[in-house]
Each structure stands twice: as structure tokens, then as C-alpha cells.
Amino acid sequence: MASTWAFEAQGPGSIPGGGASYTSFMSLETVVVLAAGEGTRMKSTTPKVLHEISGRTLLGHVLHAVSGLKSKNLCIVVGAGREHVEAHVAQIAPHAITVFQEHRGGTGHATQLALAGTSSLGTSSQGTVLVLAGDTPMLTGASLEALLDVHHKGKFAASVMTAEHPDPTGYGRIIRSADGSFLRIVEERDASDEEKAIYEVNSGVYAFDGVKLAAAIGKLKNDNSQGELYLTDVLEILRNDGGSIAAVLIEDFIEILGVNDRAQLAESAALLRDLINDNLMKAGVTIVDPISTWVDSTATVESDVTLLPGTWIAGSTKVASGAIIGPRSTLLNCTVASGAQVIESHCTGAVIGANANVGPFTYLRPGTQLGASSKAGAFVEMKNAVVGDGSKVPHLSYVGDATIGEGSNIGAATVFVNYDGVEKHHTTVGDHVRIGSDSMLVAPITIGDGAYTAAGSVITEDVPPGAIGVARAKQRNVLGWVLRKRSGTQSADAASRHDDGKKG
């Protein structure tokens, strides 16, 4: 019988005896990601691996984990929702190839298809083949590196990543000999009561000698209750053929957690939230309420940022040191400069300058650029608008398709009227302009430097620099109108008392 070995990774990217050396990763020939599952328990028209948490799809998290391994080939096995998954892969991993598993045949069958697919492209069977599932979003590149380092240094036929799970129900158990050596994997349905009491479980992540895998995988049989080919059976075939097997125990079981339903999706999202927030706080970010604060794995938050309760930093958002975000704010694909403050606002695709102030209840849409020390205040909506340094839109305004210079002030309830029913038009407001409250700026127009508009004006023509634009009807007071037209009302009574007082 061939020898088998057990190792424990003492931390991400490490193995017993010292830090991992990854120079041997040049022999990593192929990474195979199994993403063909139907995901019926998700009860969704969206393929399981395309459900999102923390800024990436489940598959996206896995591909991110393997991205630093520098394999020669990346093969993704697709099945349910093939077209959607392939389109997503083309977007986030254009160098990858996909193979289609038309009928459910098990993990062994999926791996057979992957090997055949890469072989058809002239890929060598030499080197290491890494196989993992596409629904394990917590898996880290460091743990994969630890597995590969053990595998390469020991020249094993196969190495399997394992973890100790506090609730191992549903997982294949790792069976070891008296000396701790790896013996086999027993699936839950086949395990005895004694074996079910084992907490060490199979992660579904394997490193194989490519030549030996190619020879062994053809020997798989589907004589089991599911009628499928199990990749786990390859380990036993390799042992029987004289190969040595390593079991590499990683430190944190959450890395191997798969997602099969909405509850597990939420659980993984919360675990990833906690991990990200913990790392941010250790790096100098203040998070007042970590439970209600969500930062996507794709976002960047610098030290000395303060995140207040109910905040979501999403997508590719970057928040610079000294900024204060929240409470109850969302930033999606935004850039926030140092010292800026965003209060109770929703911002998408916006650039917020240094020491700028946003909110409360502000909606910044794509194309918005706020200069340094500028302001987009309460109940303001902006879209495709550039606001110069020191300019302010304090409240109750819509600014769309506009350029505002430096030091200008836009009065309350101003509307940049940009749409004529067919096309959008641009408004240009110069430096140190004062727009009166309740002005309508009907594009396309230009308000020159230092110009004013009178409150309540509907501006339809350019206002020259230094001029004031007045576009409103002259006020006319009709005396006695209320007593004549609204007699018997409280208003008429009040007016009558006023008249009586004057007579007295």
C-alpha cells in the first residue's frame, strides 16, 4: 500500500517548518473550477454561481482566489444557465475556457470533461491540476498556496484540503489511520455513527499530479446510489496504484463553506462582512457598528475613515483617509477624497472631492463630480454634473447635465431643465455665480462669471458675466379679493378683522 500523509497549514500560506515557497507553482498546469451545479435549492432563475455577495458573484470570488496562482490553463465546467455563466466568465476571466456538462454526472465526470477540454487545446498532462468548486466564496488564495506548496514539495499523487467543521453534517469525513495518515473520504450517507462523529471534513479542493490523474480518472465507476462519478474515488484509485496522498488541514473552516440555498448565501455574506470589517478596523478604519456596515471585497477604504451605522461601501468605491461616511449611506463605484463627508445619501458612480459635503438625503448619479470643499445638500439630485471647488447646491435642487464653476451658489429649489422631451442639453454656470431660489435654468444656456439670477426666474437665454437675469411677471395685488371671492372662510374672517382694526 502506498504511503499517505497528513499536514496542517499553520496559517494562510504556511506549512509546518516555515513559510511557504511558491516558486514551484510554475508547475501548476491547470485549474479546474466546477460550476455546473443546478442549484435547485436556490429556487432562482439565476444560476447558483452567479448569485452575488460582497461585490462579486460566488464564481467571481473563487476566480479571484485562484488568480494569483498563475496557472497555465483555467477551465470552468458549466451546466445550468450555461449562456449566462459563460458570458460572466468572458467578462471577468477572458483567458479561461469553458466546457459544458450537459447531464449531471458528478464531480468525477465534470473533471473528465475539463481534462478533455484542455487536452483538445494541446495542453500537456504534465504538472499539477487543481480542482475546486465554484460556490465557495470564502476560499483564499493563501490557503490554495499552502495546499500546492505541500503537494509540490512532497511530490504527492494527490493532496486534499481539509478543515475541522463544528457541524460536519452533510460533508464527507476524513478518515485517518492511527498515526494520523490520510486513509480515505467517507461520504455522509455512507458513514457509520463513529465516522459521523469526526469533525474533519473534505473541502472539495484537490491538487493532483496531472499524469496520474489522467490515468486514474478513466477508472471511475458510477456504481453508487446517485449513479455518478465521484472525484473523491480518484484518491482511492491513486492509493491502490501506489500513489501517496496528502491531507492538508487549513486553519479556518469558513473557507470551505459552500452555498446551496439563500440561507447559506446570507450566512456567507455575513461571514465575509465580518472578516472584511475586522481587517479594516485593524488597519485603522473606525466602524461604529460593524453589524450594519457592509464593505464589498472590491472596495478600498483607507485608514482614519469613519463608517457610521447603516453604510454600504459597494463595488469599486475608494474612500480616502479622513472621510466620514454615513449614517445610512450607499456608495457604489464612487471615489471619495480625503476629508469628505457623506450623510444619509445614495451615490452611484460619483467623484466626491476633498472636504466636500454631501447630504442628508442626496442622490448622486453617474457622472457627478464634486470639487474640493463643494456641497450637495439636503434633497439634491445630481446627474452628469461637474461642480467646481467651493461651489454649493445646498438644498431641494436638481442638477443634470451641467458644469458649475468655482465659488458659485445655487439657490434652493433650482432646477436645471435639461430635457426637451427628445434630447438632453447642457447648462454652464460660471465662477462665483449666484442663482436665486426657485430658478428654472432651461438648457442649453450659459450663466456667465459673476452673474446673478433673480429668485423665481425661468431663464431661457444666456446671462452675460456680471449681469442679473430676471424672468418673471410683475407682481399685481388685487385688493379685497378674498372678501369678495372667499366670503365665510377663515381667511375672509381674518381679513375682515384686520380691516375692522384699521377702522377702529
Positions of the model-derived regions?
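Conserved alpha/beta core of the MobA/IspD/sugar-nucleotide pyrophosphorylase nucleotidyltransferase superfamily
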Residues: 27, 199-302
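Acidic, glycine-rich loop-and-beta core segments that form the ion-binding/anion-interacting portion
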Residues: 299-368
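Conserved N-terminal catalytic core of the sugar/cofactor nucleotidyltransferase
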Residues: 22-30, 56-145, 149, 153, ...
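N-terminal nucleotide-binding beta1-loop-alpha1 segment
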Residues: 26-44
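Conserved core of the sugar-phosphate nucleotidyltransferase
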Residues: 83, 139-225, 232
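Glycine-rich hexapeptide-repeat left-handed beta-helix
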Residues: 335, 342-504
